[in-house]
Amino acid sequence: FFIHGNRDFLCGQDFAKKSNLKILPDPFFMNFFDLKIALSHGDDFCTNDLKYIEFKKEVRSKKWQDEFLGKSLDDRLKIASNMRDVSQASNNDKDISIMDVTSKTIDQFFEEHRIDLLIHGHTHRPKTHHTDTGTRVVLGDWHKTGWCLMLDEQQQELKEFTL
């Protein structure tokens, strides 16, 4: 299964078919044991990061994607590299709270969808958060290690593993 993130949003059905993956909508809802669970990339919960929201709106538009994919591979690689550099520089200048989820948005999401558990990434600050509205598990980033949530009827355990 696959949920688009902020760097792999151009992966489409051809990629999914070749990789034997199913692309899930964001958010994706499921029931597991007695829990109603939502899976999300997580960036939609970072509502204070206005520059990122504007960037996402632009690059997810059909017009931008068609123009980008119409360029040569060499040009696309250069553009992508530049975009990563600009993003990294921008993030270095942002207050950490701007790039994190907002509590109000999280609470509204829990209440609107009546979920028990939200699992997301994007912020790359792995932790389990327990609030009055429900439990939120943040998965870490994937470099030399990966992250998962081990879930059964008795417990939830956030685990890091070597790739």
Task: State where each predicted segment sits.
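Residue-identity detector for glutamine
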Residues: 13, 65, 71, 88, ...
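Conserved beta-sheet core of the metallophosphoesterase superfamily
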Residues: 18-26, 36-38, 43, 49-54, ...
